[in-house]
Regions:
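Core dinuclear metal-dependent hydrolase active-site scaffold
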Residues: 13, 105-134, 138
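Active-site HxH/HxHxD metal-binding segment of metal-dependent hydrolases
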Residues: 2-7, 26-117
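Conserved beta-strand hairpin/beta-sheet module of binuclear metal-dependent hydrolase folds
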Residues: 1-41, 130-142, 147
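Divalent-metal (often Zn2+) His-rich catalytic cores of metallo-beta-lactamase-fold enzymes
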Residues: 138, 160-218
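C-terminal regulatory/interaction regions
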Residues: 213-260
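Divalent metal-coordination and catalytic microenvironments
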Residues: 14, 25, 52, 100, ...
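Active-site environment of divalent metal-dependent phosphoester hydrolases
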Residues: 30-31, 53-60, 86-88, 126-128, ...
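Active-site neighborhood of phospho(di)ester-bond hydrolases with catalytic His/Asp-centered motifs
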Residues: 23-26, 46-54, 80-83, 120-123, ...
Length: 260
């Protein structure tokens, strides 16, 4: 838990005793947390999926893999995800065993079936994915959609244009699969998925308009003067983080020619 992670990172366990389990976002290296995941799954983990490679999401995957086995094959579970992009921070480097592509499905079969469909959603990071649990109409949103705050878009690994486009993509996916609930990587479950996504996009665009207004009013200003105007509704202690997302907004505005 902390400023960047809120109440901590949510790990999700998908499956039943007869199908085995998929673990999504095993989190940082934390032996006690790994023990809890193994206990909850009886160690029968068929796949590990990381929504992205930030240090609060993916480093625990290797330890969980080493300490788990697929009960039907005796093999350790493969780590699934997308490799880090060229702009990732050193602490966010990640090379999965299985590289997931948009539309891929990771499936558990038994008396019931559990299907996770991959939705590639760059924006928070270049390698971010979300997951649709098809049978249950649930969206596992990683850090793209949070409960309690908006996610940080930290250039260059983070990209505001990609983030907004990915929100549109998630909106369409939720409509197509009748998704009502979003399971974020930080915070509690969100209901009314379509409204959440629409409101989040509107909030981002409203913030971008405030950033543009701050620059238009003071073209010779700097990040410190602009953040005080564009984020005047945000506690000052959070302005250093806000400046990272503000830079992503400025990059987006410059790309569209709205600011010099």
């Amino acid at each position: 838990a902390g400023v960047m992670t809120g109440p901590g990172t949510n790990s999700y366990i998908i499956g039943t005793p007869d199908t085995g389990y998929i673990v999504v976002d095993p989190g940082p290296v934390d032996p006690a947390h790994t023990d809890r995941l193994r206990t909850a799954t009886n160690g029968d983990i068929r796949a590990i999926i990381c929504t992205h490679s930030h240090p609060d999401h993916s480093p625990g995957a290797a330890d969980l893999k080493a300490r788990s086995r697929n009960a039907s094959t005796g093999e350790p579970p493969a780590i699934h995800g997308r490799p880090h992009g060229p702009n990732a921070r050193p602490d966010s480097h990640f090379e999965p065993d299985v590289i997931l592509q948009d539309g891929d499905r990771v499936t558990l079969s038994g008396d019931t079936q559990h299907t996770l469909q991959v939705v590639v959603t760059p924006g928070h990071t270049e390698n971010h994915i979300c997951l649709l649990l098809e049978e249950d109409g649930l969206l596992l949103s990683g850090d793209h959609i949070l409960n309690g705050s908006t996610t940080i878009i930290n250039p260059k690994d983070g990209h505001m244009g990609d983030y907004l486009a990915s929100l549109d993509k998630l909106q369409a996916a939720c409509e197509a699969h009748h998704v009502e609930f979003i399971l974020p990587a930080h915070g509690h479950v969100l209901d009314r998925a379509g409204d959440v996504i629409a409101n989040l996009k509107a909030h981002r665009l409203k913030r971008e308009a405030k950033v543009k207004a701050a620059i238009d009013a003071n073209p010779t200003g700097d990040m410190d003067t602009w953040v005080a105007v564009a984020y005047d509704d945000t506690p000052q202690v959070l302005w250093p983080l806000a400046k990272r997302s503000m830079l992503a907004h400025i990059d987006h505005l410059r790309a569209s020619g709205e600011v010099p």
